[in-house]
A protein has these predicted regions:
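N-terminal Sec-pathway targeting helices
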Residues: 1-17, 23
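Membrane-interface motif at the C-terminal end of an N-terminal transmembrane signal
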Residues: 18-35
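Secondary-structure boundary elements
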Residues: 34-120, 126
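Aromatic/pi-system hotspot detector in well-structured domains
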Residues: 88, 163, 314-315
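Short His-Asn-centered micro-motif
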Residues: 118-121, 142-144
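Hydrophobic/aromatic-rich core segments of domains that either
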Residues: 126-202
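His-Asp-centered catalytic microenvironments across diverse enzyme cores
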Residues: 167-290
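Low-complexity, disordered linker/stalk regions enriched in Pro/Thr/Ser/Gly
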Residues: 238-359
Length: 359
């Protein structure tokens, strides 16, 4: 009986100390600068037009000529041919822990790095996108991301998708290992990697499937693509992000500003053919944000988004609830505590609303 009492005391002390330790950690852990209190701003329409580069663009043609991309032997298996193109990029540059060049196309990236020949994952994905474009395929970059805020952990990785005439769908290619994914023996698109359970996916590449997924356990939470996938990106600087949970909505990521982002739960936006013409119209407007790069100021540039582009004229509501007419963009400087932003097309009916807590 004495031993039982001693054991109970030990268990109680352990539980108390464990709870105290977690409470202390919770107090000292850095809080998120911004907390999303409300996001009544999820886009589930179908009126976004995406833009892709033509294979006859001068910089694409330069890549093809300099690196003899048109000499890569065609394969009966389309995916094998694409993987040979990915391999060709890996013979010209190597992936390393370096900063992005900030260039928007593969030709400029390779020119900027000179003899270094080492590029970031983002730059590598741009180069591979343009190499695939040179072969006559529509291609785009995808970013898979996860923010485990409770553990202060951020993780992301890039893939490249090309549109397959054989399968009539987007097919995701891993840029590091040179592999691809399947579900029920059909190649997967980028959004499928996030939409489906990892246990349903197969990976075919140089790594074993087990090794490949071992360091990506908590990664598949959101998927982002550019609206404008051309070499100049002059038609749009916005991205669209498919989320599995509203927990994945963020204004910044790993202390970096995000590009103006439209969040959606509609996977159909990511699966449509590049040849499909835009016919739908949105029935309301949405809020799109971009953090100002000015240091020491918590300021955001805000726009109204409808029918795939920024609205030239609309109404914005702030904390007092009244609407004010604005043109294209306006700036919001956050105050400590709760910040509300809403927009309206007519100045009467609210279309979208977000509430942000600034700590």
């Amino acid at each position: 009986m004495i031993k039982v009492k001693k054991l109970l005391k030990i268990i109680i002390v352990a539980v108390v100390l464990g709870g105290l330790g977690y409470a202390i950690y919770d107090l000292v852990r850095p809080r998120e600068t911004y907390e999303i209190k409300l996001w009544d701003n999820i886009y589930n329409g179908d009126s976004i037009e995406f833009f892709y580069e033509e294979e006859n663009d001068l910089r694409i043609e330069m890549l093809r000529a300099i690196y003899n991309l048109d000499k890569i032997a065609k394969e009966d298996d389309e995916i094998k041919y694409i993987l040979k193109i990915v391999e060709a990029a890996g013979e010209i540059v190597t992936l390393g822990d370096v900063n992005d060049t900030k260039a928007l196309n593969g030709y400029d990236i390779i020119r900027l790095i000179g003899e270094k020949k080492t590029v970031s994952a983002k730059d590598m994905s741009i180069i591979i996108r343009d190499f695939i474009t040179s072969a006559g395929y529509n291609a785009r970059i995808g970013e898979i991301r996860c923010s485990k805020k409770d553990e202060d952990k951020y993780d992301r990785y890039y893939i490249v998708e090309y549109y397959s005439g054989k399968y009539n769908k987007w097919i995701a290619i891993d840029i590091v290992d040179g592999g691809y994914f399947t579900f029920e023996n059909t190649p997967c698109s980028g959004v499928e990697l996030v939409e489906r359970k990892k246990s349903e996916l197969r990976y075919i590449g140089n790594m074993s499937e087990e090794e490949y997924f071992s360091n990506k356990k908590n990664l598949f939470k959101s998927y982002t693509i550019m609206i404008d996938n051309t070499v100049d990106r002059i038609k749009s600087n916005s991205v669209i992000t498919y989320i599995t949970s509203k927990e994945e909505i963020a204004l910044t990521y790993a202390n970096e500003s995000l590009m103006p982002t439209i969040y959606t739960e509609n996977t159909a936006l990511f699966t449509k053919s590049p040849e499909v013409e835009l016919v739908a119209e949105d029935d309301k407007a949405y809020i799109i944000l971009m953090k100002s790069e000015e240091e020491g100021v918590e300021r955001f540039v805000v726009g109204g988004f409808k029918d795939g582009s920024i609205i030239s004229e609309y109404y914005v509501g702030r904390n007092d609830g009244s609407f004010e007419k604005v043109n294209e963009y306006f700036e919001v400087e956050l105050i400590k505590g709760k910040n509300m932003i809403s927009i309206s097309c007519d100045g009467i009916n609210e279309d979208a609303r977000i509430e942000i807590i600034y700590n």
